[in-house]
Amino acid sequence: MNSVTSQDNVLSCSVDAYEESLAEPSAAETLTESEATLVIKLGYRGTAFCGFAEQPTQRSVAGDLRRALETVLRREVELTCAGRTDAGVHAQAQYVSLPVYDADLSLSGEKLVRSLTALTDDDISIRQLFRAPQGFSARFDAQARSYRYRICADSARPILGWDHVWWYNGHLDADLMDMAAQALVGEHDFKSFCKAISAEGKPTHRFVESLSVEEIEEAGEKLIAVDITGNAFLHNMVRTIVGTLVEIGRGHRPVEWIDEVLAAKNRIAAGSCAPAQGLTFVNVRYPEGILQPW
């Protein structure tokens, strides 16, 4: 792991929040594991990141968050996220968990949010902090994950949503796309809808709880929203589903084609992988009552 960021590297605008965090006891002084887990709900604009997971030479969400946490807690930390997002993919509700020690329990939630906000750039938003039982995992305790993919099918470029929609610039029939989407609801082998190399030797069955396509309006822009909820998703699964539905929406394939793609269990049978910037990780569902305010 990288060493903890030094105080000299903290921006002047972060000093107040940073000094408040240092006023709390250091976890390094009393490394007694507590019966709690810190869970962070955060959002981010994915445009500037190589993805959530850390990469040696590129900026990542996990890297920025880890360095901020290590500055505040004054120790190394290991993060577990609800779902790894690719480069360019956004999040409104990503969840990250990390074990904490008895010394950490005295940290004020309000001060911790302020410190993490001050120590991260504008494209990361610390939304909320939770306390969960010892051993809780943001990944393995998740019951369902939800994504929204936004498409602008208008001939005019989107303005406010430019970096989080796919400007398709052509007519799409949202009703036909929605009809086709229903064939993917339930438990299926989604091998046709994931990155081929990532499926080698791995299980490709997933359960899709719901999938819908509808016309919406956001910030004055007319968009098509593809909303999907499932227990877990394969690499590029959501974006490949969107790309396949677009083939139907544009009239190049019939609604029934989706059944052929699903049955083929071959990535070549499906449509293209839709661009990353249109995808947003919007929600994670956990067992009721397991997350309590920090």
Question: What residue spans do the PLM features occupy?
Answer:
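Structured-RNA-binding interfaces characteristic of tRNA pseudouridine synthases
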Residues: 2-294
